[in-house]
Structures are given as structure tokens and as C-alpha cells.
Amino acid sequence: MLKDKKVIILGDRDGIPGQAIEACIKSAGAHVLFSTTECFVUTSAGAMDLENQKRIKGFAEEFGAENILIVLGGAEAEASGLACETVTNGDPTFAGPLAGVQLGLSCYHVVEPEIKNNVDADVYDEQIGMMEMVLDVDAIIAEIKGYREQFGKYVLAEAEV
């Protein structure tokens, strides 16, 4: 399902770092365009870093929004939801390059079954297993799914799940 996908990884210093997500994504044969680890709650009011917004917008223009998959690693549901809202419906703070830009990108958190069940299980356990135990996985999944269903134009096809 993830093989040959073009992936942008937004890890979280207090959640799951970009490097851990990257190891999982690469184990599934995906191509990582960009990977970073940010402090989701450190940025102004939880808004996505402006430089990251610029890079995401550039990749969507270069490769087509339908070909981009965003994978998040946020520690909290609300912060992860803000990131998902930004890449699907536009920057809710109207501060960055994605203000008013509805890319509708395919966006998932690494703990969601659509991602977790499609990467190497041993790599996932080694890189993410411990952190997953302390996250409120159900709340994160509900938050991301809500934004994805409301604003996402591109989601992983059922056949891919």
C-alpha cells in the first residue's frame, strides 16, 4: 500500500520523531520527500511551522497533491489535528503559505492502522512501540480521521488498506 508513495513526515519532539517514522515508512518501500521533527506545541498556538508549510505546498505543486501522503507523529490529538487541518483545508491561523489553500492531502498519523499495519512490524515495534503505549491513540485517530473525512480530497484507497 505504501510502496512507491511520496511521503512527507512531520514528527513531533514530544511524540514520535521524524526519524522513527521514516524508518517505518522506508520499510514499506515508500519514498520520503521530506522528514522533520518539530515541537508541535512550541510553535505559535500549535500552528504548523511556516517553512514546513512552504515545503509541503512546493511538493504538492511539483508532484501533484493526489500523489503526496503526509504522516504525522504528534503526541496530542489536538496538535495532530491542527497539522492535518493545515495540509487538508489550509492554515487555520492564516499566517503561513497554506492560508486559504485547500490541498486536501492524504494525511494519517503513524499509529493509525492504515499506516501501522502496512509497515514492517518489527521496525514499527522497535521505533514506535514504546511511545505508542503512552499516547492516547484512540483520540489521535478520531481527531485525524475527522479532519481527513471533512477536508481530505485524497485518501488511501480501500484496496490499499
UniProtKB/Swiss-Prot annotation:
InterPro entries linked: GRDA (IPR006812)
Alphabetically ordered keywords of this record: Oxidoreductase, Selenocysteine
Catalysis: reaction(s): acetyl phosphate + [thioredoxin]-disulfide + NH4(+) + H2O = [thioredoxin]-dithiol + glycine + phosphate + H(+); acetyl phosphate + methylamine + [thioredoxin]-disulfide + H2O = sarcosine + [thioredoxin]-dithiol + phosphate + H(+); acetyl phosphate + trimethylamine + [thioredoxin]-disulfide + H2O = glycine betaine + [thioredoxin]-dithiol + phosphate + H(+)
Pfam families: GRDA
Enzyme Commission number(s): 1.21.4.2, 1.21.4.3, 1.21.4.4
Top enzyme category: oxidoreductase
Keyword tRNA processing on entry: no
Any single GO CC term annotated in Swiss-Prot or TrEMBL for this entry: glycine reductase complex
GO MF entry, a single one: glycine reductase activity
Active site per database record: U42
Role, per record: In the first step of glycine, betaine and sarcosine reductases, the substrate is bound to component PB via a Schiff base intermediate. Then the PB-activated substrate is nucleophilically attacked by the selenol anion of component PA to transform it to a carboxymethylated selenoether and the respective amine. By action of component PC, acetyl phosphate is formed, leaving component PA in its oxidized state. Finally component PA becomes reduced by the thioredoxin system to start a new catalytic cycle of reductive deamination.
NCBIfam families: reduct_selen_A (NF040748)
Quaternary structure note: Monomer. Component of the glycine, sarcosine and betaine reductase complexes, together with components B and C.
Family of this protein: Belongs to the GrdA family.
This protein's name: Glycine/sarcosine/betaine reductase complex component A2
Organism: Photobacterium profundum (strain SS9)
